[in-house]
């Protein structure tokens, strides 16, 4: 009888040497994971500017994630918060993405980490945010 070897792809999240960042080895994205990600409520523009100027140790070139990127953090087996294990600073509410709603740049998609759902919010609303960059 031949033995079959099955590999199950797992999302590997590991903490890097730098404080306040997490590496998603599946997507090669470096995520900010700091108290501000849980505590701060800001407008879209404020979140965008914060990420633009963020530097954590050797990591810079941060930005707001696309909706697709942010949804890679959703774990539908978890609830309140519906996020992958490994993140310390999370609020079970909506987070900004850089994905504009249709052609209206006054509204952007958000991801809600209570259940993992998506919704559109006007840019003047205050929401949470999490910065990201591609691993180089």
Q: What residues fall within each predicted segment?
A:
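Sec-dependent N-terminal signal peptides
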Residues: 4-13
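Extracellular adhesion/carbohydrate-recognition regions
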Residues: 18-62, 110, 131-132
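Short hydrophobic/aromatic beta-strand or adjacent loop that forms the aromatic wall/cage
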Residues: 19, 93, 126-128
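An exposed tryptophan-centered "aromatic clamp" motif
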Residues: 48-61, 67-112
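Short, P/G- and charge-enriched loop/turn segments at secondary-structure junctions
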Residues: 115-120
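Short, structured beta-strand segments at or near domain termini in extracellular proteins/domains
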Residues: 121-136
């Amino acid at each position: 009888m031949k033995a079959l070897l099955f590999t199950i792809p797992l999302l590997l999240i590991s903490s890097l040497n730098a404080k306040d960042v997490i590496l998603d080895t599946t997507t090669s994205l470096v995520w900010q994971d700091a108290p501000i990600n849980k505590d701060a409520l800001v407008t879209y523009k404020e979140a965008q500017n914060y990420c633009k100027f963020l530097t954590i140790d050797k990591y810079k070139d941060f930005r707001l994630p696309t909706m697709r990127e942010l949804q890679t953090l959703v774990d539908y087996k978890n609830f309140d918060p519906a996020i992958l294990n490994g993140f310390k600073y999370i609020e079970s509410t909506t987070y900004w993405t850089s994905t504009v709603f249709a052609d209206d740049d006054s509204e952007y998609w958000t991801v809600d980490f209570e259940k993992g759902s998506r919704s559109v919010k006007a840019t003047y609303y205050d929401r949470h945010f999490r910065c990201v960059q591609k691993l180089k």
